[in-house]
Amino acid sequence: LLTKHIKKNIKDIPQIYVPYKEAMDVYENGLHVPEDITLVWVDDNYGYMKRVSNPKEQKRRGHSGVYYHLSYLGAPHDYLWLNTTPPVLMYEELMKSYNTGADRYWLLNVGDIKPMELGIKTFFDLAWNVDAYNIQNINNHQSKFLGHLFGEAYTSRFQNILDTYYQLAWSRKPEFMGWEREWDTKEY
């Protein structure tokens, strides 16, 4: 179908396979994905990569990529309005993926753009130049950006605010407040 409509050799047409949710089960149970197709690994919708390429997959011609969430709509609870993924967590998980071959394709699910602006900036800057960041400087990335926008003199104040915000928001996402019901797979 692709060859017919794009009029190129199938191996010259960039393609991805995203083993997300049910598709992960199919892949894990033996689905053959051609070598030139990029495997795009997904986080668990809460910032932790569910899987990265194993040594055999790292040798694939199609390499691998990541699909990362700053926003999520789905069960058991969605979070759509606030960016609560700490930059250090994003860095650790994306570098874990990058270091196992995820260098071909990075996708970020953001939902509403404006409240996710700092997370988007962190993700894009890291994707553009992974070597510019490390575990010591990634946490200051967002406060430096805000300092650049609003005045360098405020950078340390922004950092204190962001540190407190991420600590509180990560302990329990604000969108989850008021949800006291636990997820019961038998019920759903």
Region locations from a protein language model:
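Flexible loop/turn segments at secondary-structure boundaries
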Residues: 22-27, 46-49, 56, 72-77, ...
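Conserved, mostly hydrophobic/aromatic
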Residues: 39, 97, 109, 145
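Catalytic-core region of carbohydrate-active enzymes that cleave or remodel glycosidic bonds
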Residues: 81-108, 122-133
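Aromatic/acidic polysaccharide-binding cleft in carbohydrate-active enzymes
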Residues: 107-132, 176-177, 182, 186
